[in-house]
Amino acid sequence: LKTFEIKKLSEAIEYMMEKHGADTRKGSTIPYFTHPIGVMNILLEEQSFDSKINEDVILAGLFHDLNEDANVTILTIEEKFGKEVARLVKNASEPEGLKKAKDQIGNWKKRKEHSLNLLRTADKFTKMVICADKLDNARAIHRDIISGLDVWKKFNAPFDDIKWYYESILQLLKSGNSIENTRMFKLLEIEVNEIFKIPIKNCG
């Protein structure tokens, strides 16, 4: 990274941490900001293999949950960090109506079906942000399983639905504007295969 990029990235990290504040990851005491930083790190690593991944994609990964979970508007993101960052964050976020029903069990599948439908026609950069998000989440699930935690209790959906969702994401990331040949897609595929082959009785 060039000096000016490091400065901008440092400012962006500070902004993200301020907005997520003291929030924690669902069902744990782990600071929430560790997740967007993990997503950013995945994209930075991918950038070393693909020079087309620019600063906007990295920032979108860092900010991907600001609209959905920290109530930062897409317009605010655009004003502070530009149109492309805002576009990618919007593509990775649930719409307002579904966002309000986030913690309602009956709405889980409806929300995920909406996300999958958007993924069908998504551009490569949007898919990269979403792939990095899912990879960081999948790694967290895998760590919890290895630690002996009943990770599936954190979800507002049964095991089979979660499995369906992650496997559907893999299929859609491979279709259309495919990112199948990226390092992070291959890592996500490995994680998903590992997570869902573990018997549920061994997850807690």
Residue ranges of each PLM-predicted region?
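Active-site helical microenvironments for divalent-metal-assisted chemistry
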Residues: 1-204
